[in-house]
Curated annotation (Swiss-Prot):
Expressed by the venom gland. Belongs to the neurotoxin 19 (CSTX) family. 01 subfamily. Residues 21-44 form a propeptide. This is U3-lycotoxin-Ls1r. The presence of a 'disulfide through disulfide knot' structurally defines this protein as a knottin. The keyword Metal-binding does not apply. InterPro entries: Spider_toxin_CSTX_Knottin_CS (IPR011142). GO terms for cellular component: extracellular region. The lineage of its organism: Eukaryota, Metazoa, Ecdysozoa, Arthropoda, Chelicerata. It comes from the Eukaryota. Disulfide bonds join 48-63, 55-72, 62-87, 74-85. It comes from Lycosa singoriensis. It is found in: Secreted.
Length: 115
């Protein structure tokens, strides 16, 4: 009876080890594929227009800030007839980014206290 139990434990251990190796190989293949897709996407990306620069030639090309994409905002300057468009960050998104930064900083402090 002890021999059967010992043999069963050995069999389960070998099976779990082999399945863990298969899963590691599977995850490694997924990571390699994901990295290659990201590199292709970066190569395909166009140059973006920085904040407060003219975006009248393409209104969808503004750069991203930390969390949100800037928006091409058009307006007429005082005493002018021609429209001026610049990439800007709306105020509500600016406040949301500040709040997210403070929450992230506070989360780090809590993690340091309890972790």
């Amino acid at each position: 009876m002890k021999f059967v139990l010992l043999f069963g434990v050995l069999l389960v251990t070998l099976f779990s080890y082999s399945s863990a190796e298969m899963l590691d190989d599977f995850h490694q293949a997924d990571e390699d594929e994901l990295v290659s897709l990201i590199k292709k996407e970066e190569a395909r990306a166009k140059e973006c227009t920085p904040r407060f620069y003219d975006c009248s030639h393409d209104r969808h090309i503004c750069c991203r800030s930390e969390l949100f994409k800037d928006v091409c905002t058009c307006f007429y300057p005082e005493g002018g007839d021609n429209e001026v468009c610049t990439c800007q960050q709306p105020k509500h998104l600016k406040y949301m980014e500040k709040a997210a930064g403070k929450a992230k900083k506070f989360g780090g402090k809590i993690k340091k206290w309890f972790g």
